[in-house]
């Protein structure tokens, strides 16, 4: 079926309109062959290129090139008449009707998947070029070898999550307890159980510090001085001077230093911050967030000698939205802690800014609802428990007809988002680390240090 093509901007001829979609990452001959075959099906070829955020929301963690670089590469093939951006699920139906499309073309690896589009246009599955793919090309490019320090539960979750991100391999692990390290490597398919820290550092390009938090500073410093990139688990460090020193070393060595704060990198929180910064609920006047877990009294998390306690274990989570949204210029903080054996089982912190307030509750020996509420002059945002790994939040207003529910994916354990950001930053060091900045991380360390030093800490019996 042929039709007159609408003349938009005087560029379109008359004839059949063909549309195809893809990420087109690391453009290769397979992509070019598909575009050529799609062009042969009609007179005008429209190509939809996915955005970085849409890829991330679909769980596509391995995209190497930015959307603009991918768009430019598609244009330069010479087969494409028009490029559009694919931003949301279901857009294909909208585009087919909007552009009066005759033929939808896609690779044969999607055979049958897009048959539902036959209601709107002809669907053609094009033969795929064998022996080449973006994934294969990415794997042939530089791969970051990651060494893991620590073999606890979080390290065990890191290894399978890293497999969802291209451009990295877990090459080695280290634990002073050699038997534990050997078992961990055997269980997770890691080729080397390093006998010493130096041996680990000699066999990796980057280090994931997943040891007890009171050891983060020493391990991160040793790795940076050895010229390694560092991803350190939360809480990063517990003292301001340590945070400042580590970032100073990272800068001097031109190495990436990141905190493995999965909330900061997950799609829902990223969108939440962007919406709030745009003024969707007006001016923010208050934030309240809670993170509590009931912990066995014999746990190391409640060991005073190992800097255990609710603040040291959990405060990094609510500190993220408070500092991210209200800033680093905190006028005053008061801490109210219920203590047992010199460890805070539950702490409430109250923040005062010039034009806003904030508070959080953290606990290891008490339980409360783990939600977050952000109040503004025009409405508020409610994030249900567990807000720190949310895939959903609500915008609520005085006029309930304006309320909105926002859903975003949270894949697996969520660690793949921070790993993706870490690997991407190493491979593309010109990128700006804006999702969790050095200044914000240092501000969090300052709050942790204030608590450890007893500044405005009120201990309750």
Task: Name each model-derived stretch.
Residues 1-143:
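Nucleotidyltransferase catalytic core that binds NTPs
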Residues 31, 155-158, 216:
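N-terminal Rossmann-fold NAD(P) dinucleotide-binding loop
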Residues 143-188, 414, 423, 460-461:
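N-terminal Rossmann-like dinucleotide-binding module
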Residues 179, 188-246:
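Beta-loop-alpha module in the N-terminal Rossmann-like domain of NAD(P)-dependent dehydrogenases
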Residues 199, 206-208, 406, 421-461:
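C-terminal helix-rich "cap/oligomerization" subdomain common to oxidoreductases
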Residues 244-262, 283-287:
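Rossmann-fold dehydrogenase core element
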Residues 263-333:
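Predominantly a Rossmann-like dinucleotide-binding segment in NAD(P)-dependent oxidoreductases
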Residues 313, 319-390, 420-429:
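Contiguous beta-strand/loop segments that form the cofactor/metal-binding neighborhood of enzyme cores
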